[in-house]
């Protein structure tokens, strides 16, 4: 395999020019994008694409790239899609890299583009409809070349998928620094993104797509499991969801976690998905047990709630059709409801109108974008009306941070809470009601990848994590709300292996706090050093975390001091991670709620067993979590204030400004 992967070090293949492989008919493809470029902007898009190639090839490639631009709305450079090796995460020793740190990044990039992992692998999109690793295949080849030849005295800078080059640094510096979608704030609209992406100058990195840290749908299963468990506790007053019905939408890279999480919680889950390919993939991976395209047949399974057995069902069709049918079916009780359509990208494949077929929608969004937008907004109004009707009958609904409430309000749906000047919705975001408190305790989606590719190494890390949680929860003075987190996470890691969550690299996610993350990293590093693990481990996290993301409609929606629209936390986080030991860092515009609606960042840290990497892990993880807790404490969150005070007691060098609390009576007594 080393010989096969040796081509990664050669860069863009143009001597000789490879034959065009065509589109792979065995994988789904991104829908075409509407072209909103002027003639001069089109010319610039072609010129920008050709600069990756010698002048002798320009006359050959220019027409080809123009055809791609006109047909797909973007230049992917399909001719250069690699076909002589399988795109997947290979064991780290098989990568032709001088730096093992760089080799670990190559592994993570290829995992993000694995056909079993990525949503649209030919278009370099990992999840979310437009969450891109690169803008085109030339960038992929050039990046892999740089990573192959770099040393630990260099840093690769990535500008929205484009490898700007290798720059001298030192061993303590990050090997790669990634930015995606960074634009001047006044130019951060959907239209700006569409124009700049078509021109090849920016991309939407989503979260872990553009930071090379995606681990398949498992990456959100644990968080979804926690959300559902706590929704049951908060809304239904139950500790178990056995016999409860949960309805939502989406079986994509992130949303696909819903069926698995609901099954783990014991619920009956019905998820609608319009893409036949997405349904087929999740069914083949056993993340969905049953598939229906006829709602009458599906509802004939209504007795399953009485059987008290967990069940995951996919409805292949539009979620609004499902919701409206549920309104008609008075005998079916829906206990919990949400939505995970990709409404950060509402008019280009993230949300499909109920009035026409999946195929017709893909045509309309390119050829008749104005009509398509009108149909989407009408569908959003119907969607909201149906949810309101079921909520009136007792269903508890929440926004899953996908901009559903925001886009429904823009469509003039009945979604605004009266008396709030249009600033609040009648339904909560799940961060406001559930995950915000968990983040404020310092718990978030920590994850790791075993670079050996050996499932036995993953089993060992699961055992290490389980034993560590047992140790942490048995210590004296653990607050009750923290104890509950430990208990939920212990159950998760105890059962993770049997739930067969791995898709792609040998990876695991585990919600953990600052102490837990640091101790896990140290334990993994020592296990590599003493040979318990056969190869290094890469640790990371979702950007959707305690400190990683500023997003007023999701991660910071429970910030109460008016700073939910400020991005200082996410920016400070990535800067702080970079000089405290991260192997690579990333900062993005967008994330799950849309371009211009969030700033989010992440990191990767390579653990090879050395003392230096242990020190880096301790230093960086302490900052990576406590930064967000400090910010949340300053914005009047009691959980965060108590958590940061405990952190300061444990570490005398940590000194955080604590707010003085003002009496509401005093404020209200002022003569405004």
UniProtKB/Swiss-Prot annotation:
Broad EC category: lyase
Keywords tagged on the record: Histidine metabolism, Lyase, NAD
Pfam families associated with the record: Urocanase (PF01175), Urocanase_C (PF17392), Urocanase_N (PF17391)
EC number: 4.2.1.49
Catalytic function, reaction form: 4-imidazolone-5-propanoate = trans-urocanate + H2O
Required co-factors: NAD(+)
Gene3D superfamilies linked to this entry: Urocanase like domains, Urocanase superfamily
Pathway assignment: Amino-acid degradation; L-histidine degradation into L-glutamate; N-formimidoyl-L-glutamate from L-histidine: step 2/3
Residues binding NAD(+), per UniProt: 128-129, 206, 253-255, 273, 318-319, 340-344, 351-352, 400, 592
GO molecular function: urocanate hydratase activity
Domain of life: Eukaryota
GO biological process, one term: L-histidine catabolic process
Classification via NCBIfam families: PRK05414.1
UniProt family annotation: Belongs to the urocanase family.
Name of the protein this chain belongs to: Probable urocanate hydratase
Source species of the chain: Dictyostelium discoideum
């Amino acid at each position: 395999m080393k010989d096969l992967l040796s081509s990664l070090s050669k860069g863009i293949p143009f001597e000789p020019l490879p034959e065009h492989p065509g589109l792979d008919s065995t994988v789904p493809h991104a829908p075409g994008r509407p072209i909103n470029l002027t003639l001069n902007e089109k010319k610039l898009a072609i010129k920008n694409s050709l600069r990756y190639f010698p002048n002798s090839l320009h006359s050959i490639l220019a027409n080809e790239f123009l055809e791609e631009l006109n047909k797909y709305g973007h230049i992917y450079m399909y001719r250069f899609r690699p076909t002589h090796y399988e795109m997947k995460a290979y064991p780290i020793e098989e990568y032709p890299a001088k730096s093992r740190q760089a080799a670990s990044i190559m592994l993570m990039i290829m995992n993000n583009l694995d056909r079993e992992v990525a949503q649209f692998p030919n278009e370099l999109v990992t999840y979310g409809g437009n969450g891109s690793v690169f803008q085109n295949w030339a960038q992929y080849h050039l990046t892999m070349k740089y990573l192959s030849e770099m040393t630990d005295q260099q840093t690769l800078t990535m500008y929205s998928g484009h490898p700007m080059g290798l720059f001298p640094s030192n061993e303590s510096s990050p090997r790669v620094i990634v930015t995606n979608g960074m634009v001047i704030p006044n130019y951060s609209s959907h239209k700006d993104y569409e124009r700049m992406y078509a021109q090849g100058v920016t991309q939407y990195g989503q979260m872990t797509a553009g930071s090379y840290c995606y681990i398949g749908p498992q990456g959100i299963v644990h968080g979804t499991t926690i959300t559902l468990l706590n929704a049951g506790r908060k809304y239904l007053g139950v500790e178990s969801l056995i016999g409860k019905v949960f309805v939502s939408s989406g079986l994509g890279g992130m949303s696909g976690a819903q069926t698995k999480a609901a099954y783990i919680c014991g619920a009956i889950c019905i998820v609608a998905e319009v893409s036949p390919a997405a349904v087929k993939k999740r069914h083949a991976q056993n993340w969905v047990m049953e598939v229906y395209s006829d709602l009458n047949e599906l509802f004939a399974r209504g007795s399953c709630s009485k059987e008290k057995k967990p069940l995951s069902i996919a409805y292949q069709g539009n979620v609004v059709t499902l919701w409206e049918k549920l309104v008609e079916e008075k005998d079916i009780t829906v206990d919990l409801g949400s939505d995970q359509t990709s409404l950060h990208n509402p008019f280009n494949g993230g949300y499909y109108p109920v009035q026409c077929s999946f195929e017709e929608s893909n045509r309309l969004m390119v050829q008749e974008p104005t009509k398509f937008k009108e149909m989407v907004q009408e569908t959003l109004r119907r969607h909201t009306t149906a949810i309101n009707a079921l909520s009136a009958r007792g269903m508890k609904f929440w926004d899953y941070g996908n901009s559903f409430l925001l886009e429904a309000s823009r469509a003039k749906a009945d979604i605004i809470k009266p008396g709030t000047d249009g600033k609040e919705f009648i339904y909560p975001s799940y961060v406001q009601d559930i995950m915000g408190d968990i983040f404020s305790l310092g718990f978030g989606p920590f994850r790791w990848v075993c670079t050996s590719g050996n499932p036995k190494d993953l089993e060992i890390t699961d055992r290490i994590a389980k034993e560590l949680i047992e140790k942490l929860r048995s210590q004296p003075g653990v607050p009750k709300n923290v104890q509950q987190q430990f208990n939920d996470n212990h159950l998760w890691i105890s059962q993770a292996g049997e739930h067969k969550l791995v898709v792609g690299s040998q990876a695991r996610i585990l919600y953990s706090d600052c102490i837990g993350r640091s101790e896990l990293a140290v334990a993994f590093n020592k296990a590599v050093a003493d040979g318990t693990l056969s190869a290094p481990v890469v640790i990371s996290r979702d950007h959707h975390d305690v400190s990683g993301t500023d997003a007023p409609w999701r991660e910071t929606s429970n910030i109460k001091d008016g700073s939910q629209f400020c991005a200082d936390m996410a920016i400070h986080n990535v800067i702080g991670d970079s000089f405290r030991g991260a192997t690579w860092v990333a900062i993005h515009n967008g994330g799950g709620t849309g371009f211009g609606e969030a700033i989010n960042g992440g990191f990767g840290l390579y653990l090879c067993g050395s003392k230096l990497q242990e020190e880096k892990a301790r230093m960086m993880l302490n900052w990576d979590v406590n930064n967000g807790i400090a910010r949340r404490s300053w914005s009047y969150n009691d959980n965060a204030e108590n958590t940061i005070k405990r952190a300061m007691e444990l570490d005398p060098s940590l000194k955080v400004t604590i707010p003085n609390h003002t009496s509401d009576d005093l404020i209200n007594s002022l003569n405004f």
